[in-house]
Design a protein with these regions (language model features):
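Conserved anion-binding
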Residues: 50-55, 59-61, 84-110, 114-210
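Glycine-rich phosphate-binding active-site loops on the catalytic face of alpha/beta enzymes
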Residues: 45-56, 118-124, 174-177, 218-243
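N-terminal amphipathic/basic-hydrophobic helices that include classical n-h-c signal peptides
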Residues: 1-21
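Short loop/turn motifs at secondary-structure junctions
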Residues: 42, 113, 166, 218-221
């Protein structure tokens, strides 16, 4: 993401001053109590996993009241603790889905107050359009949809092209062979050939060194990184000291 400021010198001449701010999206957050520490480290978005077969799946409890959506676990815990007014730092919530029906996604969007939908499966551009048309403006003023694009070989980059003007951002999930500083030039070349106008994020087997190389090389469309296993410990919780290595690399 970039912010452009116009500055004026003492002679009245102006020039643009551009600042780049990289965003950090941490996927598969499994506990509410992790959020304050992630917020403190400058994380912009957290991902809640709604893929049922995944070990990080966000469980919910059936409300047993007709069509009323299920309650989220965190809401149940708040009620038990009479803590309905407790404040949690504001970080955008991302819902992670794979080949789900739009209605299922919309239900979880409302229950968990999601700002972004991250699609991991074989969803088509038409599905994204239908989802957004079902939500905006009747249910929410806006909802962002990010589409995951898995990159294993050079032939995979073109898969991003159909999602132009449909997805709000692309997430390029890089094979480990791409996650090296000496591959950044090739990544840049592939992206330039696509001539994308859609913002994008990078994820995969990331390292702080690789992230630093990316930040220095890619275009203003490069919004930031998605972290998950790189900062996850054996208890499936996010390791803050490891996260700090990535935040330093983005500065």
């Amino acid at each position: 993401m970039q912010i452009e400021l116009i500055i004026e010198n003492k002679n009245g001449q102006t020039r643009p001053l551009i600042y780049y701010f990289m965003k950090i999206y941490v996927a598969n957050v499994i506990s509410r109590d992790e959020i304050p520490a992630l917020y403190k480290e400058g994380v912009d978005m957290i991902g809640l996993n709604f893929i049922k077969e995944d070990s990080c799946y966000v469980k919910s409890i059936n409300s047993h009241v007709g069509t009323i959506p299920n309650y989220s676990i965190e809401e149940i815990n708040q009620r038990k603790n009479n803590n309905t007014t407790a404040e949690t730092p504001i970080i955008k919530r991302v819902g992670i889905f794979k080949d789900d029906m739009p209605q299922t996604i919309i239900t979880q969007m409302m229950v968990y107050k999601l700002s972004v939908i991250h699609l991991m499966g074989d969803e088509l551009p038409l599905m994204i359009d239908n989802l957004k048309n079902s939500v905006i403006p009747d249910l929410k003023e806006d909802i962002k949809v990010y589409k995951n694009i898995t990159i294993k070989t050079s032939d995979d980059w073109i898969k991003a092209k159909p999602f132009e003007s449909h997805a709000d951002a692309l997430i390029f999930d890089l094979n480990e062979t791409y996650c090296q500083c000496d591959k950044v030039e090739e990544i840049e070349k592939q992206l330039n050939q696509l001539q994308l106008s859609t913002p994008y994020y990078i994820c995969g087997e990331l390292s702080p060194a690789f992230v630093s190389c990316l930040k220095s090389s890619l275009s203003p469309l490069f919004q930031g990184i998605v972290l998950d296993k790189e900062i996850t410990n054996d208890n499936k919780r996010k390791d803050i000291s490891t996260l700090q290595n990535f935040t330093k690399a983005l500065k």
